[in-house]
Amino acid sequence: MQTYTTQMDAARKGIVTPQMETVAKKEYRTVEEIRQLVAEGKVAIPANKHHECLNPEGIGSMLRTKINVNLGVSRDCKDYNIEMQKVMSAVNMGAEAIMDLSSHGNTQPFRQKLTHECPVMIGTVPVYDSVIHYQRDLATLTAQDFIDVVRLHAEDGVDFVTLHCGITRKTIEQIRKHKRKMNIVSRGGSLVFARMCMTGNENPFYEHFDEILDICEEHDVTISLGDACRPGCLADATDVCQIEELVRLGELTKRAWAHNVQVMVEGPGHVPLNQVAANMEIQKTICMGAPFYVLGPLVTDIAPGYDHITAAIGGAVAAMSGAAFLCYVTPAEHLALPNVDDVKQGIVASKIAAHAADIAKGIPHARDIDDKMGDARRVLDWDAQFACALDPETAKAIRDARLPEDDHSDTCSMCGKFCAVRSMNKALAGEYIDIL
């Protein structure tokens, strides 16, 4: 029996893994199509060998658009019970991935709970954990310290890790020279940048990339190449710093693939609507079709409290134009750690964006549920409409709180007997149409 190290290694050897079979069924594709796409790096199936309860998903522009939910504790909000409520909400609402971005206390028990109990893909950002794991100042951490935390997360079963490998000491010169309005807004990227400035040392994730690849190959961890220089405002979109880093991420993608390590590439950020599609095309060219994982992008800077909407607008265009993976954004973005309701609103907005893009791209069977909704609405079958809804609970609650009168209970309180659907059904059936 032929053995393999990673999903990519298996695919290149002609082996169809159980994970590939699952993805093929979900995506209405042949297993050979999925195997070939994984072999080429155009589809990633993040699936750590230790995440035994995982229900695997494929991430690629030609597949259904997937969404990720960020959560985790901070120094100011450190109740893991609340974070587990967010986890359950994410799983129940159909999110395909969860990233634990915890930045306070002992993070390992929560991370292990996720990989032992949660069926969706789990991701982390090891650089966050480095400072709190060792309880030492950033400047005192060695390159080996950072590498060991990557190994710890891999051993704990996380399916993908965001690593800010693309910024180097050259980036310090670029940031100072080009004077961005928002500098670096990536939390992980800013930590790497700060350490380089304080110590004079190179980015450990870049300098020791081959050692990190060995870890990822051993445990089959997908690398999500973090974009430290993603634009944090419209003024910085598609600038020299962003593109220079993207070119380096393309080079690192080749190196990872040479080790049979799967790759996703992270992208912006804050981007004007007219630049979103172009950003997707640039990434596809530079990174050779590796799955693109975008934060939003947010298409305006002026909507704190509503950034789940600005991100959904950008996310729909991005996914339609080639992005494979959307990181959700909540109403609390730029303001606070999201609460349970914020998380739900963020998931709904991102799921709408992903679904709308899948319809536009012609993803197999993406529109089936919309057609079922149309059928249910035509016959005023409310239970069937709720069954088709992205969020049935909310839809039913709104209707139940404002029911129409009994003599037109098949309609809603917006139109009552003026309901166009009711009138057309009666007219086409040859029935008398009572309005008053």
Question: Each predicted region: which residue ranges?
Answer:
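Alpha/beta enzyme core
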Residues: 6-300, 306, 312-325
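Basic/polar N-terminal segments that are highly enriched at the extreme N-terminus
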Residues: 1-5, 436
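Short acidic alpha-helix initiation/capping motifs at coil-to-helix transition points
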Residues: 1, 11-15, 404
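C-terminal catalytic subdomain
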Residues: 302-311, 317-363
